[in-house]
Amino acid sequence: MTTQAPPSNLLPLNPEQLARLQAATTDFTPTQLAWVSGYFWGVLNQQSGAAVAAPAPAAEVPTITLISASQTGNARRVAEALRDDLLAAKLNVKLVNAGDYKFKQIAAEKLLVVVTSTQGEGEPPEEAVALHKFLFSKKAPKLDGTAFAVFGLGDTSYEFFCQSGKDFDNKLAELGAERLLDRVDADVEYQAAAAEWRARVVEALKARAPVAAPAQLATSGAVNDIHTSPYTKEAPLTATLSVNQKITGRNSEKDVRHIEIDLGDSGLRYQPGDALGVWYQNDPQLVKELVELLWLKGDEPVTVEGKTLPLSEALQWHFELTVNTATIVENYATLTRSESLLPLVGDKAQLQQYAAATPIVDMVRFSPAQLDAEALIGLLRPLTPRLYSIASSQAEVESEVHVTVGVVRYEIEGRARAGGASSFLADRVEEDGEVRVFIEHNDNFRLPANPETPVIMIGPGTGIAPFRAFMQQRAADGAQGKNWLFFGNPHFTEDFLYQVEWQSYVKEGLLTRIDLAWSRDQQQKIYVQDKLREQGAELWRWINDGAHIYVCGDANRMAKDVENTLLEVIAEYGAMDAEAADEFLSELRVERRYQRDVY
């Protein structure tokens, strides 16, 4: 339907002004037009002496609070898309990152939507830990006046699939809130499920919340300060790998690479604490092995996202081959009627255990079958990029980005296996070769705004990466705050990552203290948490001086051990019981003085 413009003599604009306005707004979305309407109304009201009649008070429009709890950016993208959908439907919405949400106001929420991922062993994403703890504490209020919906993102290769979403959904209902929609648990291929859920949420909320006037939309705090980049996960930058240097010794059990990527004149920006997303290709030899095991040729046509590709090309570029899941094992067993795998079907624990220990290609080798190409594609998950903590600051390296990559290598019955992305960077991209990358911003792992604030950095293994970026930034800023690094690895002589750089920072006085834990250099294993305990009194003094604490690395063991040790130190030197120590650390987290980048 076309709306006819009124006669020009009835308009308050002359033809030239009208033409300029139409040209300026020709490509605006309905949401942007609504915002502009409210913006001009605000400008008019601010003009001194403007003789404008005050509009009649509008009926109060309830705000939909949309909480984004993201670990790798996917939950944030779903939440942003839902925000745009709600604004397009003229609903009043406020999007807030879980780390910024004042959770004690939750009792006042009328309409609440949570989009959350899960990390580690079923834990909430880092930015949602404080909210999660609050809801599960004795302080959580009754939520009888709240209606809610939850969308969970997860990965079926992990045992506690979408556990954070399940936790929020169950706890909100337990506290008396009304469930608007059944929770959705989405796997790594979440886009279709998210689009369907968003449409249902919009319809459910339209029935609950009246449409807001444009000015009300514009003043509702609807748009959060979310980063935008010229390149994204969906449209990555094709950059150049300029340096691939092994930084562990020849006798090390680990293969760790320092990777430098030239961003050219792309204008791609990042901050210390951000992650680099890397799109990789599977090893052609792995593709060939899998195809041959299934008695296929590799040139069979298959359909991927509406395009027809040869099977081998589809497997190399579009499907996950290095991570098996319980679902894949179960579906393969059912499809092939495998005598060795069928007994696992229905036993979640056994399926999970088998998938964790057996790559897809070895599952096919141990339980051979013949599948057609489309059946194989139907079993597999789409390839997803890997995220690496950035190990550089643009204040020092300008148009480069550095990452520290632990290359995954192991054997299955004498056959060499490797991680998909790590071996791609280490083995298959030549220097000056192309690699597709994007920045995943992480505002939950940031240096203190005040350069005089002390910083405590705890990062064993490749967890050292963001702290290299931190120190480059502190050096460039001339920051006067003290810096203390805890680092650990198996052997001093083989595994001291960036040793010369850390020694230089110590010599210059920028790195105030460094404590090193070498787990295999003596009979008794020593880890970073042991060094924390050993330095407990001094650690407590730094905390009392306002230090910010950062932890980076393994989520499943190290991060938990470090947190337990921090609680012990707080309890002992702060003269607190366990409950008070936990409350103290939670408060540090809320104040952004305890931040973690764990994976």
From Swiss-Prot:
Transmembrane segments: none annotated. Gene3D superfamilies: 3.40.50.360, NADPH-cytochrome p450 Reductase, Chain A, domain 3 (1.20.990.10), Nucleotide-binding domain of ferredoxin-NADP reductase (FNR) module (3.40.50.80), Translation factors (2.40.30.10). InterPro entries: CysJ (IPR010199), CysJ-like_FAD-binding (IPR003097), CysJ_Proteobact (IPR029758), FAD-bd_FR_type (IPR017927), Flavdoxin-like (IPR001094), Flavodoxin/NO_synth (IPR008254), Flavoprot_Pyr_Nucl_cyt_Rdtase (IPR001709), Flavoprotein-like_sf (IPR029039). GO terms for cellular component: cytosol. It catalyses: hydrogen sulfide + 3 NADP(+) + 3 H2O = sulfite + 3 NADPH + 4 H(+). CDD domains: SiR. Pathway: Sulfur metabolism; hydrogen sulfide biosynthesis; hydrogen sulfide from sulfite (NADPH route): step 1/1. Residues 64-202 form the Flavodoxin-like domain. Its cofactor is FAD; FMN. FMN binds at residues 70-75, 117-120, 153-162. NADP(+) binds at residues 519-520, 525-529, 561. Its EC number is 1.8.1.2. Residues 234-448 form the FAD-binding FR-type domain. Signal peptide: none annotated. SUPFAM superfamilies: Ferredoxin reductase-like, C-terminal NADP-linked domain, Flavoproteins, Riboflavin synthase domain-like. GO terms for biological process: cysteine biosynthetic process; hydrogen sulfide biosynthetic process; sulfate assimilation. FAD binds at residues 322, 356, 386-389, 404-406, 410, 419-422, 599. Binds 1 FAD per subunit. Binds 1 FMN per subunit. One of its GO terms (molecular function) is sulfite reductase (NADPH) activity. Alpha(8)-beta(8). The alpha component is a flavoprotein, the beta component is a hemoprotein. PANTHER family: NADPH OXIDOREDUCTASE A, NITRIC OXIDE SYNTHASE-RELATED. NCBIfam families: cysJ, PRK06214.1, PRK10953.1. Belongs to the NADPH-dependent sulphite reductase flavoprotein subunit CysJ family. This is Sulfite reductase [NADPH] flavoprotein alpha-component.
